[in-house]
């Protein structure tokens, strides 16, 4: 604890700053303790010329000052002092620290690393077969900041299994436990940061980007990881290049020019720059001078907060800068801590007392730690007081303290006395360590990484230096606040960076060239659809589905058949009503006048049977509309053909009788006429119907019609219909009827009618003509009409056939019965003279009269 006098001096120094006297900050970078922690911080930067001209293994001179490095060192100092003042973490023990400057150069970081590994109380690193009992000067190391340095120092510390906790090295390679078994860090690895960057590109629809990295291990590995992440998300890298690290001469300027030329050639509007600070500075320095068009820059954490890059003149013209910074707990007391220690560093009495207390730390070996730190003021470091990585340093110290607490098995009363803890013993308790810092729970995973959230930062220019504004967050998934983002475009519209335009709904990509992001948009045809926006081929609908052109989904097909409510069916039902009404009317008249010469000349009971059959033909039409079923399909043809056969067989008997009476000799006519009337006539009808039954049975057994669903006939519907399996068998089912009609026509076409008598042959001739015209027209019409309308065609053919027979044969007789009853005489219909009334019952007399 600081004494009252010191506190008073510090208060006086804060009230009277800027005396111009040198500070003693460099003497505050070391403190003794029971266990000492080493620290590697970029307190300064070495001159490039000095590094290139180095010919002897001497230490380079670090002349330039790094304010962030000093603040991070003070954060470690504050954390150690807090732990020493607490009674719950390491009671009774005191931590010390030994902080060194790395100059951000591996060659400079080597010397303090060797010093840390020297045996406690000496300057030497002795060679042993077994280092299990080896006690180095420090128990663990905090740092370094950069991955480049951690790659070098990590090999040293890993050999001795000395825990090393970096507060800024984020390279994924450092997670390899085989190579770096003692490496830990309080920042997420680059993979997490690059995953967030890839999610950002995907969020804004940027799939045509350039990816640049610094020409070092950090940049090369970052580009390798990003390439894999981008490919998995459908992001195309138009150009991938390395930015050379700057040197004192201009030998690498041409390479920077080539990189920028390639970026311009690729016409990208978004560039991922995963580079170190110096590489980013060199790239932007040349970009500004060459007037590179503004772009969206996705920054790596390494240069996003760099004053060196932010302060470049003209940097505001480079476009929009977005990047991710890790989120940690706020260290509210840290700014006051820095102010207090800067004030103490101006007090000669405090500095003198500090020098006496810290003697014996071998200054002659390490030299003055940070001479440039003794010439600063609060204004030099005020900009970085709230730097995001300050918390990482603070957390790194607490992680080591918690591991030491676990190793020593400390409790509220103290830590049990035991031999000094070796680094490898501490390391065993570092794995999967859980600790709390500032109320935030942290845990090292098996690779030594911590899981921390990222804030999405945007550069917002206020004057000559930008400020970082939060515009989103990443904790495994990205959330952005788009309304807060100010784009560099004139209308503040989000820039577009795509090789090809976004395909419209129902279009898929046809890739051209080598990049999957460069493509033509092709419409999906009917019957296919685009399932996902990134599809390169249309997905076909299932057979029970359909889709229009340029569709994004399929629709269920509805069943299509000849429904009852369709206009064609309604029209046919009207025709059915007409035909059935005429049949019933004719049947009623014939039954009522069944004993009249007209009805007897028309066949008597056979004529009534024929009309009943015509009525059944009309009713069979009702089997065709409606949803098809197996029973309907099987019944349609037999139930329409058999009644028609019965009707045609009665007409055939009429035609045969007329032919016999008119064309054959009288002796033959007398014998045959008896066979064409009475029981023998019914036998002919039965025989004809049995033949039709046989044909229909063969048709149903050999080639039964079946209900089928055709998914391809109609574009949007599933056609359900009765499929005829054999058109030959279908035609043979009509053979009996066609034969009867043909014989009727032949028997009546050339018959001479008797003058003064009713011409019975003419009605039969025209009835058969109507039959043939109907069914001959039916064949080509059925072959060319849509399948769904085929039942309607057959319905129409049946009804027209019935109407034709009625109109030609039955209706004229009905007219005579109703309008000219005086002609309903035996003489007019049977051919006898006016006084020969008995001739109607005498077959021979009747036949003689006809021939006369």
UniProtKB/Swiss-Prot annotation:
Keywords: Cell membrane, G-protein coupled receptor, Glycoprotein, Membrane, Receptor, Sensory transduction, Signal, Taste, Transducer, Transmembrane, Transmembrane helix. Residues 1-20 form the signal peptide. Changing residue 537 to T/S/E/V: Abolished the response to brazzein. It is found in: Cell membrane. PANTHER family: CALCIUM-SENSING RECEPTOR-RELATED, TASTE RECEPTOR TYPE 1 MEMBER 3. Belongs to the G-protein coupled receptor 3 family. TAS1R subfamily. This is Taste receptor type 1 member 3. It comes from Homo sapiens.
